[in-house]
């Protein structure tokens, strides 16, 4: 009998990279594998994508794991370095790094390195999180061009705040700021992540940085799924029934008795709960697949179990397979039901969930 298991489909992952190349044919791909590749496994994901042009991570530790695992492609530190003492390692490992503040720039100017570092100057075009403000950007850029520890030319990167809202006007403003600053500068350019790739072809430039869409999940909050853009779900969260019980009309289920059956039915108990990372907020009616058939969760999600209404005539039995999201049940639907973003759902599964990779 199978307990909570994440099944990662390598074929779907490779398909998605190819599909994104079709959407941005003139751009190189930074496959973003931060946060354990959005819950898909850092090394296994990188090894599945030998055709990616580079990999993007959030922490130096993630980059070092890639190198230790045999990944030789360029690795971009999307948030830059947090400590000047890391610069010799970044140089020796040929990592690319974002540079987004005065402290990082000063550290580069003062460092003693054997080789210069490939730098992506981060321009704050409107996210207002990391990056150099436009009014300070020319002076900052000039210092980078004069720094002996920076490999020339300097590349330029930014990030959209509302790429998933095509009618709000914010992305056009960010693009205008980015284009104005980049004009006449020789370095590579990148501003498009998943939403930019899908909705803003004018933003693709030299490099794009697919994150969640690489894993077959839509970044948009418009009820779309990855399949609407030709991508396939890479992750399936699976488990099995551990019990099937007769349940009488009028009987409650689970903590607090929040769901009461309106008919005689058969109740399935699934080995899955918030201890595995499944959202405790999932309301009654949230769908799961049992033997490929959609049935609703009933009652509260517990730490280790959820209950589902199999129906009065159900023939399901203990040990039968359950899919919580993935193939046949997009995680975007679960996100909509639970009000928990798909990003969080796929990235927050706990260590007791087994990982299985298939082709």
From Swiss-Prot:
Swiss-Prot/TrEMBL cofactor(s): pyridoxal 5'-phosphate
GO molecular function list: alanine racemase activity; pyridoxal phosphate binding
Pathway: Amino-acid biosynthesis; D-alanine biosynthesis; D-alanine from L-alanine: step 1/1
Binding site for substrate: 129, 303
Protein's GO biological process: D-alanine biosynthetic process
Keywords: Isomerase, Pyridoxal phosphate
Gene Ontology cellular component list: cytosol
Alphabetized InterPro entries for the sequence: Ala_racemase (IPR000821), Ala_racemase/Decarboxylase_C (IPR009006), Ala_racemase_C (IPR011079), Ala_racemase_N (IPR001608), Ala_racemase_pyridoxalP-BS (IPR020622), PLP-binding_barrel (IPR029066)
Catalytic residues of the enzyme: 34, 255
Keyword Isomerase: yes
Catalytic activity: L-alanine = D-alanine
Family listed: Belongs to the alanine racemase family.
Name this protein carries in UniProt: Alanine racemase
Gene that produces this protein: alr
């Amino acid at each position: 009998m199978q307990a909570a298991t994440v099944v990662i489909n390598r074929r779907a992952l490779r398909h998605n990279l190819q599909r994104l190349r079709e959407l941005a044919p003139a751009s190189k791909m930074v496959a973003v594998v931060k946060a354990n590749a959005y819950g898909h496994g850092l090394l296994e994901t990188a090894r599945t994508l030998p055709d990616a042009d580079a990999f993007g991570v959030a922490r130096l530790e993630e980059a070092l794991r890639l190198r230790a695992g045999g990944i030789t492609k360029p690795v971009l530190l999307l948030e830059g370095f947090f400590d000047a003492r890391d610069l010799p390692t970044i140089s020796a490992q040929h990592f690319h790094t974002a540079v987004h503040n005065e402290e990082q720039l000063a550290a580069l100017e003062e460092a003693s390195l054997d080789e210069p570092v490939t730098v992506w100057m981060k321009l704050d075009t409107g996210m207002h999180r990391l990056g150099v403000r436009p009014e300070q950007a020319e002076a900052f850029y000039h210092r980078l061009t004069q720094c002996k520890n920076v490999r020339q030319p300097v590349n330029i990167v930014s990030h959209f705040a509302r790429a998933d809202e095509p009618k709000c006007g914010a992305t056009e403003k960010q693009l205008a700021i980015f284009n104005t600053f980049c004009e006449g500068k020789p370095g590579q350019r990148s501003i498009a992540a998943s939403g930019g790739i899908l909705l803003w072809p004018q933003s693709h430039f030299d490099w794009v940085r697919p994150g969640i869409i690489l894993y077959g999940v839509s970044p948009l909050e418009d009820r779309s799924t990855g399949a609407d853009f030709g991508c396939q779900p890479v992750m399936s969260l699976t488990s099995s029934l551990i019990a099937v019980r007769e349940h009488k009309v009028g009987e409650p289920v689970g903590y607090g008795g929040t769901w009461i059956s309106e008919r005689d039915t058969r109740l399935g108990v699934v080995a899955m709960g918030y201890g595995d990372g499944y959202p405790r907020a999932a309301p009654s009616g949230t769908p799961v697949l049992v033997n490929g058939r959609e049935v609703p969760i009933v009652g509260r999600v517990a730490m280790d179990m959820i209950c589902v209404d199999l129906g009065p005539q159900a023939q399901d039995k203990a040990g039968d397979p359950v899919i919580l999201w993935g193939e046949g049940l997009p995680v975007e639907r679960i996100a909509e039901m639970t009000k928990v973003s798909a990003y969080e759902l796929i990235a927050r599964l706990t260590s007791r969930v087994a990982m299985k990779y298939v082709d």
